[in-house]
Amino acid sequence: MSNSAFNRRWAELLLEALTRHGLRHVCIAPGSRSTPLTIAAAANNKLICHTHFDERGLGHLALGLSKASREPVAVIVTSGTAVANLYPSLIEASLTGERMVFLTADRPPELMDCGANQAIRQNGIFASHPCQTISLPRPTVDIPASWLASVIDHSMANLQHGAVHINCPFAEPLYGNEEPAYDEWQQQLGDWWKSKTPWLSQPVAKVVAEVPDWDCWQQKKGVVLAGRMSAEEGVNVAKWAKALSWPLIGNALSQTGQPLPCADLWLDNPHVQEILAQAQLVVQFGSSLIGKCLLQWQAKCQPQEFWIIDPIPGRLDPANHRGKKLTCHIADWLLAHPAQPCIPWAQSCTLWAEELIVWSEKAVNCVRTELAGKFGEATVAYRLRELLPERGQLFVGNSLIIRLIDTLGQLPAGYPVYSNRGASGIDGLISTAAGVQRATAKPTLAVIGDLSALYDLNSLALLRHPSAPMVLIVVNNNGGQIFSLLPTQEEARQRFYCMPQYVNFDHAAAMFGLKYASPQNWMELQQSIKQAWQQNETTLIELKVPDREGAECLQQLLKQVAML
Protein backbone atom coordinates (compact mmCIF):
# COMPACT_ATOMS: atom_id res chain seq x y z
CA MET A 1 0.00 0.00 0.00
CA SER A 2 1.16 3.56 -0.70
CA ASN A 3 2.01 6.31 1.73
CA SER A 4 -0.92 8.33 0.40
CA ALA A 5 -3.45 5.83 1.74
CA PHE A 6 -1.95 5.60 5.22
CA ASN A 7 -1.31 9.34 5.41
CA ARG A 8 -5.05 9.71 4.91
CA ARG A 9 -5.94 7.25 7.67
CA TRP A 10 -3.52 8.96 10.06
CA ALA A 11 -4.95 12.40 9.33
CA GLU A 12 -8.53 11.13 9.65
CA LEU A 13 -7.82 9.87 13.15
CA LEU A 14 -6.06 13.09 14.13
CA LEU A 15 -8.98 15.29 13.01
CA GLU A 16 -11.59 12.98 14.54
CA ALA A 17 -9.77 13.05 17.88
CA LEU A 18 -9.86 16.86 17.82
CA THR A 19 -13.64 16.88 17.35
CA ARG A 20 -14.03 14.96 20.61
CA HIS A 21 -12.84 18.12 22.40
CA GLY A 22 -15.42 20.50 21.01
CA LEU A 23 -13.46 21.57 17.94
CA ARG A 24 -15.85 22.46 15.11
CA HIS A 25 -14.04 25.02 12.93
CA VAL A 26 -11.01 24.35 10.72
CA CYS A 27 -9.27 27.08 8.72
CA ILE A 28 -7.40 25.80 5.67
CA ALA A 29 -4.85 27.38 3.32
CA PRO A 30 -3.93 25.86 -0.05
CA GLY A 31 -0.91 23.58 -0.23
CA SER A 32 0.16 20.15 -1.39
CA ARG A 33 2.03 18.80 1.64
CA SER A 34 -1.04 19.38 3.81
CA THR A 35 -3.27 17.32 1.48
CA PRO A 36 -3.89 14.46 3.97
CA LEU A 37 -5.06 16.93 6.63
CA THR A 38 -7.14 19.00 4.22
CA ILE A 39 -8.97 16.03 2.72
CA ALA A 40 -9.56 14.50 6.16
CA ALA A 41 -11.04 17.76 7.43
CA ALA A 42 -13.26 18.15 4.38
CA ALA A 43 -14.56 14.58 4.76
CA ASN A 44 -15.45 14.94 8.44
CA ASN A 45 -19.07 16.09 8.70
CA LYS A 46 -18.51 17.37 12.24
CA LEU A 47 -16.20 20.08 10.93
CA ILE A 48 -16.91 23.45 9.31
CA CYS A 49 -14.14 24.31 6.87
CA HIS A 50 -13.04 27.89 6.15
CA THR A 51 -10.47 28.78 3.50
CA HIS A 52 -8.15 31.68 2.77
CA PHE A 53 -5.19 32.06 0.42
CA ASP A 54 -3.15 34.15 2.88
CA GLU A 55 -1.81 32.21 5.87
CA ARG A 56 -1.33 35.30 8.02
CA GLY A 57 -4.97 36.24 7.49
CA LEU A 58 -6.00 32.61 7.93
CA GLY A 59 -4.43 32.48 11.39
CA HIS A 60 -6.28 35.62 12.41
CA LEU A 61 -9.54 34.27 10.95
CA ALA A 62 -9.13 31.30 13.29
CA LEU A 63 -8.31 33.67 16.14
CA GLY A 64 -11.59 35.53 15.59
CA LEU A 65 -13.56 32.29 15.37
CA SER A 66 -12.12 31.08 18.67
CA LYS A 67 -12.53 34.48 20.30
CA ALA A 68 -16.26 34.66 19.62
CA SER A 69 -17.17 30.95 19.86
CA ARG A 70 -15.01 30.32 22.95
CA GLU A 71 -14.11 26.99 21.37
CA PRO A 72 -10.83 25.57 20.09
CA VAL A 73 -10.24 26.19 16.37
CA ALA A 74 -7.78 24.39 14.09
CA VAL A 75 -5.57 25.79 11.33
CA ILE A 76 -4.11 23.68 8.52
CA VAL A 77 -1.20 24.95 6.39
CA THR A 78 1.45 23.46 4.16
CA SER A 79 5.17 23.42 4.90
CA GLY A 80 7.69 26.24 4.56
CA THR A 81 7.07 29.94 5.09
CA ALA A 82 3.33 29.23 5.22
CA VAL A 83 4.03 28.11 8.79
CA ALA A 84 5.95 31.26 9.68
CA ASN A 85 3.03 33.41 8.56
CA LEU A 86 0.98 32.01 11.46
CA TYR A 87 3.30 33.54 14.05
CA PRO A 88 1.39 36.82 14.69
CA SER A 89 -1.93 35.09 15.35
CA LEU A 90 -0.28 32.46 17.54
CA ILE A 91 1.40 35.17 19.63
CA GLU A 92 -1.91 36.99 20.04
CA ALA A 93 -3.66 33.80 21.14
CA SER A 94 -0.91 33.11 23.66
CA LEU A 95 -1.54 36.53 25.23
CA THR A 96 -5.33 36.65 25.10
CA GLY A 97 -6.07 32.98 25.73
CA GLU A 98 -7.96 31.84 22.63
CA ARG A 99 -7.57 28.08 22.18
CA MET A 100 -6.05 27.28 18.79
CA VAL A 101 -4.57 24.17 17.22
CA PHE A 102 -1.97 24.82 14.51
CA LEU A 103 -1.57 21.76 12.27
CA THR A 104 1.49 22.39 10.11
CA ALA A 105 2.33 19.89 7.40
CA ASP A 106 6.04 19.19 7.02
CA ARG A 107 8.55 17.36 4.87
CA PRO A 108 9.78 14.05 6.35
CA PRO A 109 13.14 14.03 8.20
CA GLU A 110 15.16 12.76 5.23
CA LEU A 111 14.33 15.97 3.32
CA MET A 112 15.61 18.31 6.03
CA ASP A 113 18.88 20.27 5.62
CA CYS A 114 19.65 18.85 2.18
CA GLY A 115 18.35 21.56 -0.15
CA ALA A 116 14.90 20.04 -0.65
CA ASN A 117 12.30 22.52 -1.82
CA GLN A 118 9.99 24.18 0.72
CA ALA A 119 11.68 22.38 3.61
CA ILE A 120 12.50 24.52 6.63
CA ARG A 121 13.09 23.68 10.29
CA GLN A 122 9.54 23.80 11.62
CA ASN A 123 9.99 21.99 14.91
CA GLY A 124 10.11 24.65 17.60
CA ILE A 125 9.66 27.46 15.07
CA PHE A 126 7.31 29.32 17.43
CA ALA A 127 9.74 29.19 20.38
CA SER A 128 8.02 29.57 23.76
CA HIS A 129 4.80 31.14 22.48
CA PRO A 130 2.70 27.95 22.13
CA CYS A 131 1.59 26.44 25.41
CA GLN A 132 2.45 23.05 23.87
CA THR A 133 4.55 21.89 20.92
CA ILE A 134 4.10 18.39 19.51
CA SER A 135 6.35 16.96 16.80
CA LEU A 136 4.56 13.94 15.39
CA PRO A 137 6.56 11.17 13.72
CA ARG A 138 6.16 10.22 10.09
CA PRO A 139 2.91 8.20 9.83
CA THR A 140 3.57 4.46 10.07
CA VAL A 141 1.52 1.37 10.87
CA ASP A 142 4.15 0.46 13.45
CA ILE A 143 2.68 3.14 15.74
CA PRO A 144 -0.65 2.08 17.29
CA ALA A 145 -3.71 4.19 16.54
CA SER A 146 -4.26 4.44 20.28
CA TRP A 147 -0.94 6.31 20.60
CA LEU A 148 -2.00 9.06 18.20
CA ALA A 149 -5.45 9.37 19.80
CA SER A 150 -3.90 9.56 23.27
CA VAL A 151 -1.40 12.23 22.25
CA ILE A 152 -4.16 14.44 20.84
CA ASP A 153 -6.43 13.81 23.84
CA HIS A 154 -3.71 14.67 26.33
CA SER A 155 -2.84 17.84 24.44
CA MET A 156 -6.43 19.04 24.19
CA ALA A 157 -7.24 18.23 27.81
CA ASN A 158 -4.40 20.53 28.84
CA LEU A 159 -5.21 23.25 26.30
CA GLN A 160 -6.90 25.74 28.60
CA HIS A 161 -5.41 28.92 27.13
CA GLY A 162 -3.37 29.76 24.05
CA ALA A 163 -2.19 27.62 21.16
CA VAL A 164 -0.78 24.16 20.58
CA HIS A 165 1.51 23.58 17.61
CA ILE A 166 1.32 20.09 16.11
CA ASN A 167 3.89 19.53 13.37
CA CYS A 168 2.84 16.78 10.96
CA PRO A 169 5.43 15.34 8.54
CA PHE A 170 4.07 13.48 5.52
CA ALA A 171 6.13 11.54 2.99
CA GLU A 172 5.14 11.28 -0.66
CA PRO A 173 3.13 10.13 -2.44
CA LEU A 174 0.43 12.45 -1.13
CA TYR A 175 -2.06 11.49 -3.82
CA GLY A 176 -3.07 8.13 -5.14
CA ASN A 177 -5.64 5.39 -5.01
CA GLU A 178 -8.73 6.56 -3.13
CA GLU A 179 -9.84 3.02 -2.34
CA PRO A 180 -10.13 2.29 1.41
CA ALA A 181 -6.93 0.88 2.88
CA TYR A 182 -5.42 0.39 6.30
CA ASP A 183 -8.87 0.15 7.87
CA GLU A 184 -7.52 -2.47 10.25
CA TRP A 185 -5.13 0.14 11.72
CA GLN A 186 -8.01 2.52 12.46
CA GLN A 187 -10.17 -0.30 13.76
CA GLN A 188 -7.72 -0.90 16.59
CA LEU A 189 -9.89 1.70 18.34
CA GLY A 190 -13.02 -0.45 18.00
CA ASP A 191 -16.33 1.22 18.79
CA TRP A 192 -14.60 4.51 19.68
CA TRP A 193 -15.37 5.59 16.15
CA LYS A 194 -19.09 5.38 16.92
CA SER A 195 -18.80 7.28 20.19
CA LYS A 196 -18.51 11.01 20.85
CA THR A 197 -15.96 10.93 23.66
CA PRO A 198 -12.15 11.09 23.74
CA TRP A 199 -10.11 7.90 23.71
CA LEU A 200 -8.28 9.18 26.79
CA SER A 201 -10.48 11.23 29.08
CA GLN A 202 -8.63 13.60 31.43
CA PRO A 203 -11.09 15.79 33.34
CA VAL A 204 -9.52 19.05 34.51
CA ALA A 205 -10.46 20.19 38.00
CA LYS A 206 -12.21 23.55 38.12
CA VAL A 207 -10.43 25.57 40.77
CA VAL A 208 -11.52 28.93 42.16
CA ALA A 209 -8.80 31.04 43.75
CA GLU A 210 -10.60 32.04 46.93
CA VAL A 211 -9.72 34.85 49.34
CA PRO A 212 -10.37 33.49 52.88
CA ASP A 213 -10.70 36.91 54.50
CA TRP A 214 -13.00 38.36 51.84
CA ASP A 215 -15.55 39.43 54.48
CA CYS A 216 -12.92 41.71 55.96
CA TRP A 217 -11.67 43.11 52.66
CA GLN A 218 -15.11 44.03 51.35
CA GLN A 219 -15.54 46.40 54.26
CA LYS A 220 -12.61 48.51 53.03
CA LYS A 221 -12.61 51.27 50.44
CA GLY A 222 -12.21 49.54 47.11
CA VAL A 223 -11.83 50.51 43.46
CA VAL A 224 -12.76 48.11 40.65
CA LEU A 225 -10.89 48.15 37.33
CA ALA A 226 -12.44 46.26 34.42
CA GLY A 227 -10.40 45.15 31.43
CA ARG A 228 -11.10 42.54 28.77
CA MET A 229 -13.85 40.07 29.64
CA SER A 230 -17.01 38.53 28.20
CA ALA A 231 -20.30 40.41 27.95
CA GLU A 232 -21.89 38.30 30.68
CA GLU A 233 -18.91 38.83 32.97
CA GLY A 234 -18.99 42.57 32.34
CA VAL A 235 -22.61 42.84 33.44
CA ASN A 236 -21.95 40.77 36.57
CA VAL A 237 -18.84 42.76 37.53
CA ALA A 238 -20.84 45.99 37.23
CA LYS A 239 -23.58 44.60 39.50
CA TRP A 240 -20.98 43.36 41.99
CA ALA A 241 -19.22 46.73 42.18
CA LYS A 242 -22.53 48.57 42.53
CA ALA A 243 -23.61 46.32 45.40
CA LEU A 244 -20.37 47.14 47.20
CA SER A 245 -20.67 50.86 46.40
CA TRP A 246 -17.18 50.69 44.92
CA PRO A 247 -16.40 52.91 41.92
CA LEU A 248 -15.96 50.94 38.71
CA ILE A 249 -13.56 52.17 36.05
CA GLY A 250 -14.19 50.04 32.98
CA ASN A 251 -12.53 50.27 29.59
CA ALA A 252 -14.18 49.79 26.20
CA LEU A 253 -13.56 46.03 26.27
CA SER A 254 -15.10 45.44 29.69
CA GLN A 255 -18.74 45.49 28.52
CA THR A 256 -19.66 46.84 31.96
CA GLY A 257 -21.47 49.85 30.50
CA GLN A 258 -18.66 52.08 31.79
CA PRO A 259 -20.71 53.65 34.62
CA LEU A 260 -18.00 56.32 35.00
CA PRO A 261 -17.39 57.25 31.33
CA CYS A 262 -14.50 59.29 29.92
CA ALA A 263 -12.27 57.95 32.70
CA ASP A 264 -9.08 58.59 30.81
CA LEU A 265 -9.93 62.30 30.76
CA TRP A 266 -10.77 62.83 34.44
CA LEU A 267 -8.24 60.41 35.95
CA ASP A 268 -5.48 62.95 35.32
CA ASN A 269 -7.25 65.61 37.38
CA PRO A 270 -5.46 66.28 40.72
CA HIS A 271 -8.75 66.40 42.67
CA VAL A 272 -9.73 62.97 41.35
CA GLN A 273 -6.36 61.54 42.26
CA GLU A 274 -6.77 62.78 45.82
CA ILE A 275 -10.08 60.94 46.05
CA LEU A 276 -8.72 57.70 44.60
CA ALA A 277 -5.70 57.83 46.89
CA GLN A 278 -8.08 56.77 49.68
CA ALA A 279 -8.49 53.33 48.09
CA GLN A 280 -7.38 50.52 50.37
CA LEU A 281 -7.98 47.78 47.81
CA VAL A 282 -7.93 47.77 44.00
CA VAL A 283 -9.54 44.78 42.28
CA GLN A 284 -8.85 44.40 38.57
CA PHE A 285 -10.94 41.99 36.50
CA GLY A 286 -9.36 41.02 33.20
CA SER A 287 -6.27 42.41 31.52
CA SER A 288 -5.76 44.71 28.50
CA LEU A 289 -6.35 48.08 30.11
CA ILE A 290 -6.29 50.66 27.32
CA GLY A 291 -6.21 54.28 28.47
CA LYS A 292 -2.84 55.90 29.08
CA CYS A 293 -4.04 57.83 32.13
CA LEU A 294 -5.66 54.71 33.58
CA LEU A 295 -2.45 52.76 33.11
CA GLN A 296 -0.48 55.58 34.74
CA TRP A 297 -2.83 55.65 37.72
CA GLN A 298 -2.78 51.87 37.97
CA ALA A 299 1.01 51.95 38.03
CA LYS A 300 1.36 54.55 40.78
CA CYS A 301 -1.62 53.74 43.03
CA GLN A 302 -0.66 52.42 46.46
CA PRO A 303 -3.52 50.46 48.01
CA GLN A 304 -2.92 47.99 50.79
CA GLU A 305 -3.35 45.26 48.19
CA PHE A 306 -3.91 45.00 44.43
CA TRP A 307 -5.78 41.95 43.13
CA ILE A 308 -6.06 40.73 39.55
CA ILE A 309 -8.69 38.14 38.64
CA ASP A 310 -8.12 36.61 35.21
CA PRO A 311 -8.23 33.04 33.87
CA ILE A 312 -4.94 33.44 31.98
CA PRO A 313 -1.95 32.26 34.05
CA GLY A 314 1.05 34.46 34.69
CA ARG A 315 1.79 37.92 36.01
CA LEU A 316 -0.47 40.60 34.56
CA ASP A 317 0.62 43.59 36.62
CA PRO A 318 3.48 45.60 35.05
CA ALA A 319 3.63 47.76 38.21
CA ASN A 320 4.27 44.72 40.45
CA HIS A 321 1.93 45.72 43.27
CA ARG A 322 1.70 43.86 46.52
CA GLY A 323 -1.42 41.72 46.42
CA LYS A 324 -2.86 38.67 44.69
CA LYS A 325 -3.02 37.19 41.18
CA LEU A 326 -6.15 35.01 41.26
CA THR A 327 -6.10 32.70 38.26
CA CYS A 328 -9.66 31.55 37.65
CA HIS A 329 -12.73 32.45 35.63
CA ILE A 330 -14.24 35.78 36.59
CA ALA A 331 -17.78 34.38 36.87
CA ASP A 332 -16.64 31.64 39.26
CA TRP A 333 -14.73 34.11 41.43
CA LEU A 334 -17.72 36.44 41.70
CA LEU A 335 -19.92 33.55 42.85
CA ALA A 336 -17.38 32.61 45.51
CA HIS A 337 -17.02 36.22 46.71
CA PRO A 338 -20.51 37.75 46.79
CA ALA A 339 -20.97 41.40 47.61
CA GLN A 340 -22.60 42.13 50.95
CA PRO A 341 -24.20 45.58 50.60
CA CYS A 342 -24.93 46.03 54.32
CA ILE A 343 -21.49 47.09 55.52
CA PRO A 344 -20.64 49.60 58.24
CA TRP A 345 -19.17 52.35 56.06
CA ALA A 346 -21.59 52.04 53.12
CA GLN A 347 -22.81 55.63 53.43
CA SER A 348 -19.35 57.19 53.28
CA CYS A 349 -18.38 54.91 50.42
CA THR A 350 -21.46 55.97 48.48
CA LEU A 351 -20.50 59.64 48.90
CA TRP A 352 -16.97 58.87 47.73
CA ALA A 353 -18.31 57.15 44.62
CA GLU A 354 -20.80 59.94 43.99
CA GLU A 355 -18.01 62.52 43.88
CA LEU A 356 -16.34 60.55 41.10
CA ILE A 357 -19.66 60.54 39.25
CA VAL A 358 -19.59 64.34 39.32
CA TRP A 359 -16.12 64.41 37.78
CA SER A 360 -17.17 61.91 35.13
CA GLU A 361 -20.16 64.09 34.25
CA LYS A 362 -17.90 67.13 33.96
CA ALA A 363 -15.68 65.26 31.51
CA VAL A 364 -18.67 64.11 29.46
CA ASN A 365 -19.92 67.69 29.28
CA CYS A 366 -16.51 68.84 28.01
CA VAL A 367 -16.61 66.17 25.30
CA ARG A 368 -20.15 67.09 24.32
CA THR A 369 -19.26 70.78 24.03
CA GLU A 370 -16.00 70.17 22.16
CA LEU A 371 -17.60 67.89 19.55
CA ALA A 372 -20.87 69.77 19.05
CA GLY A 373 -21.53 70.17 15.33
CA LYS A 374 -18.30 68.40 14.34
CA PHE A 375 -17.81 65.30 12.21
CA GLY A 376 -14.66 63.23 12.46
CA GLU A 377 -13.12 60.22 14.14
CA ALA A 378 -13.53 61.73 17.61
CA THR A 379 -17.25 62.23 16.96
CA VAL A 380 -17.60 58.65 15.72
CA ALA A 381 -15.89 57.39 18.87
CA TYR A 382 -18.11 59.52 21.11
CA ARG A 383 -21.36 58.55 19.37
CA LEU A 384 -20.44 55.00 18.40
CA ARG A 385 -23.26 53.39 20.38
CA GLU A 386 -25.74 55.08 18.00
CA LEU A 387 -24.27 53.05 15.11
CA LEU A 388 -24.33 49.62 16.77
CA PRO A 389 -26.62 46.99 15.23
CA GLU A 390 -29.41 45.64 17.39
CA ARG A 391 -28.52 42.23 18.84
CA GLY A 392 -25.16 42.56 17.13
CA GLN A 393 -21.52 42.92 18.11
CA LEU A 394 -18.57 45.28 17.78
CA PHE A 395 -14.98 44.67 16.74
CA VAL A 396 -12.54 47.49 17.48
CA GLY A 397 -9.14 47.87 15.86
CA ASN A 398 -5.96 49.12 17.49
CA SER A 399 -3.94 52.32 17.50
CA LEU A 400 -5.73 55.69 17.76
CA ILE A 401 -9.33 54.57 17.16
CA ILE A 402 -9.58 52.25 20.19
CA ARG A 403 -8.06 54.93 22.42
CA LEU A 404 -10.65 57.44 21.22
CA ILE A 405 -13.52 54.99 21.76
CA ASP A 406 -12.20 54.08 25.20
CA THR A 407 -11.71 57.72 26.22
CA LEU A 408 -14.74 59.42 24.67
CA GLY A 409 -17.41 56.75 24.24
CA GLN A 410 -19.73 54.80 26.51
CA LEU A 411 -20.75 51.42 25.15
CA PRO A 412 -23.89 49.60 26.37
CA ALA A 413 -23.54 47.13 29.23
CA GLY A 414 -23.45 43.55 28.00
CA TYR A 415 -22.95 44.49 24.34
CA PRO A 416 -20.33 42.11 22.88
CA VAL A 417 -17.04 43.85 22.07
CA TYR A 418 -14.00 42.12 20.57
CA SER A 419 -10.47 43.25 19.80
CA ASN A 420 -6.86 42.08 19.54
CA ARG A 421 -5.36 43.71 22.63
CA GLY A 422 -2.78 41.09 23.54
CA ALA A 423 0.18 42.29 21.48
CA SER A 424 -2.03 45.15 20.20
CA GLY A 425 -0.73 44.93 16.63
CA ILE A 426 -2.46 46.32 13.56
CA ASP A 427 -1.96 43.09 11.61
CA GLY A 428 -4.85 40.73 10.96
CA LEU A 429 -7.67 42.98 12.17
CA ILE A 430 -9.97 42.51 9.16
CA SER A 431 -9.49 38.74 9.23
CA THR A 432 -10.08 38.57 12.98
CA ALA A 433 -13.30 40.54 12.57
CA ALA A 434 -14.34 38.13 9.82
CA GLY A 435 -13.81 35.22 12.20
CA VAL A 436 -15.85 36.89 14.93
CA GLN A 437 -18.74 37.38 12.50
CA ARG A 438 -18.61 33.81 11.20
CA ALA A 439 -18.57 32.34 14.71
CA THR A 440 -21.74 34.10 15.84
CA ALA A 441 -23.63 34.90 12.61
CA LYS A 442 -24.56 38.25 14.19
CA PRO A 443 -24.67 41.68 12.55
CA THR A 444 -21.18 43.05 13.07
CA LEU A 445 -19.68 46.53 13.12
CA ALA A 446 -15.89 46.69 12.80
CA VAL A 447 -13.93 49.93 13.15
CA ILE A 448 -10.25 50.12 12.14
CA GLY A 449 -7.74 52.63 10.82
CA ASP A 450 -6.43 53.08 7.28
CA LEU A 451 -2.99 51.54 7.89
CA SER A 452 -4.63 48.57 9.62
CA ALA A 453 -6.86 48.10 6.58
CA LEU A 454 -3.89 48.26 4.20
CA TYR A 455 -1.96 45.79 6.34
CA ASP A 456 -4.72 43.16 6.03
CA LEU A 457 -6.20 44.18 2.68
CA ASN A 458 -6.11 40.58 1.36
CA SER A 459 -8.62 39.62 4.02
CA LEU A 460 -11.37 41.72 2.48
CA ALA A 461 -11.89 38.50 0.52
CA LEU A 462 -13.18 36.94 3.75
CA LEU A 463 -15.99 39.51 3.94
CA ARG A 464 -17.58 38.72 0.58
CA HIS A 465 -20.35 36.46 1.86
CA PRO A 466 -21.16 37.20 5.52
CA SER A 467 -23.95 35.26 7.22
CA ALA A 468 -25.39 38.52 8.59
CA PRO A 469 -24.98 42.21 7.74
CA MET A 470 -21.45 43.49 8.29
CA VAL A 471 -20.08 47.02 8.24
CA LEU A 472 -16.37 47.78 8.13
CA ILE A 473 -15.64 51.41 8.98
CA VAL A 474 -12.17 52.44 7.82
CA VAL A 475 -11.16 55.68 9.54
CA ASN A 476 -8.82 57.19 6.96
CA ASN A 477 -6.73 59.81 8.73
CA ASN A 478 -3.87 59.29 6.27
CA GLY A 479 -1.41 57.24 8.25
CA GLY A 480 -0.58 56.25 11.78
CA GLN A 481 -1.83 59.41 13.42
CA ILE A 482 -1.47 58.02 16.91
CA PHE A 483 2.16 59.03 16.42
CA SER A 484 1.01 62.63 16.16
CA LEU A 485 1.04 62.51 19.95
CA LEU A 486 4.81 61.94 20.00
CA PRO A 487 7.08 64.90 20.86
CA THR A 488 9.17 64.49 17.70
CA GLN A 489 10.19 66.86 14.92
CA GLU A 490 7.39 67.22 12.37
CA GLU A 491 9.23 66.13 9.24
CA ALA A 492 10.75 63.09 10.93
CA ARG A 493 7.40 62.20 12.52
CA GLN A 494 5.64 62.15 9.15
CA ARG A 495 8.37 60.21 7.36
CA PHE A 496 9.28 57.62 9.97
CA TYR A 497 6.16 57.27 12.14
CA CYS A 498 2.89 58.43 10.57
CA MET A 499 3.86 57.33 7.04
CA PRO A 500 0.86 58.85 5.18
CA GLN A 501 -0.15 56.78 2.15
CA TYR A 502 -2.67 59.11 0.43
CA VAL A 503 -4.99 56.26 -0.56
CA ASN A 504 -8.73 55.79 -0.95
CA PHE A 505 -10.53 52.50 -0.37
CA ASP A 506 -13.23 52.65 -3.04
CA HIS A 507 -11.16 50.55 -5.45
CA ALA A 508 -10.36 48.02 -2.72
CA ALA A 509 -14.06 47.56 -2.02
CA ALA A 510 -14.77 47.19 -5.74
CA MET A 511 -11.97 44.64 -6.22
CA PHE A 512 -13.50 42.36 -3.59
CA GLY A 513 -17.13 43.03 -4.54
CA LEU A 514 -18.06 44.91 -1.38
CA LYS A 515 -20.49 47.78 -1.12
CA TYR A 516 -18.86 51.15 -0.51
CA ALA A 517 -19.85 54.48 0.98
CA SER A 518 -17.93 57.61 1.94
CA PRO A 519 -20.26 59.78 4.05
CA GLN A 520 -19.37 63.44 4.52
CA ASN A 521 -21.40 64.17 7.64
CA TRP A 522 -23.07 62.44 10.56
CA MET A 523 -26.47 62.20 8.89
CA GLU A 524 -24.98 60.52 5.81
CA LEU A 525 -23.06 58.10 8.03
CA GLN A 526 -26.20 57.15 9.92
CA GLN A 527 -28.07 56.63 6.66
CA SER A 528 -25.30 54.44 5.21
CA ILE A 529 -25.21 52.35 8.38
CA LYS A 530 -29.00 52.03 8.48
CA GLN A 531 -29.09 50.74 4.91
CA ALA A 532 -26.23 48.32 5.56
CA TRP A 533 -28.04 46.62 8.45
CA GLN A 534 -30.91 45.71 6.12
CA GLN A 535 -28.85 43.49 3.78
CA ASN A 536 -26.80 40.33 4.30
CA GLU A 537 -23.62 41.69 2.78
CA THR A 538 -20.58 43.71 3.72
CA THR A 539 -20.41 47.47 3.37
CA LEU A 540 -17.05 49.22 3.56
CA ILE A 541 -17.58 52.74 4.88
CA GLU A 542 -14.58 55.02 4.47
CA LEU A 543 -14.43 58.02 6.77
CA LYS A 544 -12.00 60.51 5.29
CA VAL A 545 -11.06 62.74 8.19
CA PRO A 546 -8.45 65.48 8.75
CA ASP A 547 -5.09 63.92 9.55
CA ARG A 548 -4.64 65.15 13.10
CA GLU A 549 -8.20 65.92 14.15
CA GLY A 550 -8.59 62.89 16.41
CA ALA A 551 -5.22 63.19 18.14
CA GLU A 552 -5.53 66.96 18.62
CA CYS A 553 -9.07 66.64 19.99
CA LEU A 554 -7.86 64.08 22.53
CA GLN A 555 -5.00 66.32 23.63
CA GLN A 556 -7.29 69.34 23.95
CA LEU A 557 -9.84 67.47 26.08
CA LEU A 558 -7.15 66.07 28.37
CA LYS A 559 -5.92 69.60 29.06
CA GLN A 560 -9.45 70.92 29.65
CA VAL A 561 -10.47 68.27 32.16
CA ALA A 562 -7.14 68.30 33.99
CA MET A 563 -7.65 72.01 34.72
CA LEU A 564 -11.25 71.77 36.01
UniProtKB/Swiss-Prot annotation:
Intrachain disulfide bonds: none
Keyword Manganese belongs to the record: yes
Co-factor requirement: Mg(2+); Mn(2+); thiamine diphosphate
Gene Ontology terms for molecular function: 2-succinyl-5-enolpyruvyl-6-hydroxy-3-cyclohexene-1-carboxylic-acid synthase activity; magnesium ion binding; manganese ion binding; thiamine pyrophosphate binding
GO biological process, any: menaquinone biosynthetic process
Keywords, alphabetical: Magnesium, Manganese, Menaquinone biosynthesis, Metal-binding, Thiamine pyrophosphate, Transferase
Cofactor binding note: Binds 1 thiamine pyrophosphate per subunit.
Pfam annotation, one family: TPP_enzyme_N
Domain of life: Bacteria
EC numbers: 2.2.1.9
Involved pathway(s): Quinol/quinone metabolism; 1,4-dihydroxy-2-naphthoate biosynthesis; 1,4-dihydroxy-2-naphthoate from chorismate: step 2/7; Quinol/quinone metabolism; menaquinone biosynthesis
Reaction catalysed by this enzyme: isochorismate + 2-oxoglutarate + H(+) = 5-enolpyruvoyl-6-hydroxy-2-succinyl-cyclohex-3-ene-1-carboxylate + CO2
Function: Catalyzes the thiamine diphosphate-dependent decarboxylation of 2-oxoglutarate and the subsequent addition of the resulting succinic semialdehyde-thiamine pyrophosphate anion to isochorismate to yield 2-succinyl-5-enolpyruvyl-6-hydroxy-3-cyclohexene-1-carboxylate (SEPHCHC).
Assembly and interaction partners: Homodimer.
PANTHER family for this protein: 2-SUCCINYL-5-ENOLPYRUVYL-6-HYDROXY-3-CYCLOHEXENE-1-CARBOXYLATE SYNTHASE (PTHR42916), PROTEIN PHYLLO, CHLOROPLASTIC (PTHR42916:SF1)
Similarity comment text for this entry: Belongs to the TPP enzyme family. MenD subfamily.
UniProt name for this protein: 2-succinyl-5-enolpyruvyl-6-hydroxy-3-cyclohexene-1-carboxylate synthase
Native species: Photorhabdus laumondii subsp. laumondii (strain DSM 15139 / CIP 105565 / TT01)
Gene: menD
